[in-house]
From Swiss-Prot:
The gene is rpmJ. The lineage of its organism: Bacteria, Pseudomonadati, Pseudomonadota, Betaproteobacteria, Burkholderiales. The keyword Ribosomal protein applies. This is Large ribosomal subunit protein bL36. NCBIfam families: rpmJ_bact (TIGR01022). One of its GO terms (biological process) is translation.
Length: 37
């Protein structure tokens, strides 16, 4: 899980979603998981 100021899609499987006001990236590749903070 990366904590980044700006979250970006790293591949075509990445999806940017919003959970409880937190922007997150979910992906089939666990290395691509990110959250904004």
């Amino acid at each position: 899980m990366k904590v980044a100021a700006s979250v970006k899609k790293m591949c075509r499987n990445c999806k940017v979603i919003r959970r409880k006001g937190v922007v997150r990236v979910i992906c089939t590749d666990p290395r691509h998981k990110q959250r904004q903070g």
